[in-house]
């Protein structure tokens, strides 16, 4: 079989791309929004209420994935998935750890897991983390012990934008030292990232910038509120101001990359940790059904884009399903960092797909488990069960039996309005069996609702959770 000319050119382009990075490793910038819904960015095409030219520029200069997902509908678990490149259910990080002083404060991203920071630091990268953590409160889980040279941010799940102390258990930290005062967290995190990039101009550097925007509390300064005087709803106006501030902050960081002359040697990702929590007031999800904490599309499909100017196509829209787990192996591939054979990534290297060397789908299927809720997408088909349940409150998924399961064709029905389960029982059974096969490789939640090991009640402070391997279900 002879390769097509286009495929040959794509292979040559990818080989050249990786060849150059062998001598000059690219910088890597990962920008994470908090609770940003699928429908709020202007580049997504559903609303122009909040101009986001800087975030939009990443899509303009790179690839925007319209079927971009995260591996759960909730905050800390998807961050754990990004950090490891693995489904968080593989190591029991199914729910949020904390808050501080609660029974689950002793838990976080298991110490047995290697992070993207660990691997890039070992490869000679300067590594910096500026913003939210939410991967554990205790010292063993601190970013400075998870592969990062610098940290400026907070360890918990939510924080005041204006008060450095936040609550007494979750202050803004520089390294391990508490700051006495801040201006506005969104601006502060961007300034710290800019400083880091400036100090490491010689490269290579990895900058992780997880904003707490646009997560509550709803707080903004007059600078941003004054941009939306035509909005009468106070909450919506404040939300718009918060998102506008985040876009400005992204612009500040991107400008520093350009100032350093590093735009063509910097791989950039932007995504959100889960879907928006409400329909209109605080981050909407456009045409998608459901919200944060639900496994309908509105909870798990998110804005997702990547840029590597001059190396991957610009202005490309790609509808193939991808997931935040892919960022870790993609970054390692770009950096020519070979992960050990036991890394067991669930994510894949996206570079050959965006350059055209590979034409198929990066994933045969994507999977979700969040308490009682389950979901799977394979091609255009999606099975979902328990999406309306409160996965945070209790219960856990067993087998994906078809009773009560919903089936949708997302190509024709992105809003999940027409349940086709009754018309396609064979497809429903096929996807349920596929989910069961995936879930057999997971373990029970290490803490939180439905956790069997009762780790939250028994482990010592600072010890990683030791959840139990899932047993085969008979029901």
Annotated model-derived regions:
Residues 2, 9, 13-406, 414-437, ...:
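Formylglycine-dependent sulfatase
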């Amino acid at each position: 079989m002879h390769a097509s000319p286009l495929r040959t050119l794509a292979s040559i382009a990818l080989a050249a791309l990786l060849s150059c990075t062998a001598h000059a490793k690219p910088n890597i910038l990962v920008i994470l929004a908090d609770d940003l819904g699928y429908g709020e960015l202007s580049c997504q095409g559903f609303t122009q209420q909040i101009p986001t030219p800087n975030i939009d520029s990443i899509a303009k200069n790179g690839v925007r994935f319209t079927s971009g997902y995260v591996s759960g509908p909730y905050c800390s678990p998807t961050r754990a998935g990004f950090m490891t490149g693995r489904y968080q259910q593989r190591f029991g990080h199914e729910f949020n750890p904390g808050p501080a002083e609660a029974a689950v404060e002793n838990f976080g991203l298991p110490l047995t897991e290697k992070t993207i920071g660990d691997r890039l630091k070992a490869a000679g990268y300067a590594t910096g983390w500026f913003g939210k953590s939410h991967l554990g409160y205790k010292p063993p889980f601190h970013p400075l012990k998870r592969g990062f040279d610098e940290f400026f941010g907070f360890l918990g799940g939510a924080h005041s934008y204006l008060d450095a102390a936040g609550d007494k258990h979750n202050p803004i930290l520089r390294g391990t030292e508490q700051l006495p005062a801040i201006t506005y967290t969104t601006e502060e995190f961007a300034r710290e990232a800019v400083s880091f990039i400036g100090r490491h101009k010689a490269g290579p550097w990895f900058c992780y910038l997880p904003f707490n925007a646009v997560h509550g509390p709803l707080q903004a300064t007059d600078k941003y509120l004054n941009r939306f005087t035509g909005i009468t709803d106070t909450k919506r106006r404040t939300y718009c101001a918060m998102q506008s501030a985040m876009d400005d902050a992204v612009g500040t960081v991107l400008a520093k990359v350009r100032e350093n002359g590093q735009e063509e040697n910097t791989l950039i990702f932007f995504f959100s940790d889960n879907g928006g929590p409400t329909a209109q007031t605080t981050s909407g999800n456009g045409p998608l059904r459901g919200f944060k904490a639900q496994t309908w599309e509105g909870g798990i499909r998110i804005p997702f884009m990547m840029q590597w100017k001059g190396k991957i196509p610009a202005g490309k829209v790609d509808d193939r399903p991808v997931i935040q787990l892919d960022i870790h192996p993609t970054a390692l591939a770009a950096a020519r960092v070979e992960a050990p054979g036991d890394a067991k990534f669930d994510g894949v290297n996206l570079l050959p797909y965006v350059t055209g060397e590979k034409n198929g789908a990066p994933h045969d299927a994507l999977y979700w488990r969040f308490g009682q809720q389950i979901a799977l997408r394979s091609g255009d088909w999606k099975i979902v069960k328990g999406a309306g349940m409160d996965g945070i409150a209790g219960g856990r998924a067993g087998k994906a039996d078809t009773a009560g399961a919903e089936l949708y064709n997302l190509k024709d029905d992105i809003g999940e309005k027409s349940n086709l389960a009754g018309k396609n029982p064979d497809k429903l059974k096929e996807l349920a069996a596929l989910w069961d096969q995936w879930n057999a490789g997971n373990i029970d939640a290490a803490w939180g609702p439905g956790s069997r090991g009762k780790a939250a009640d028994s482990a010592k402070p600072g010890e990683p959770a030791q959840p139990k391997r899932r047993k085969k279900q008979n029901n």
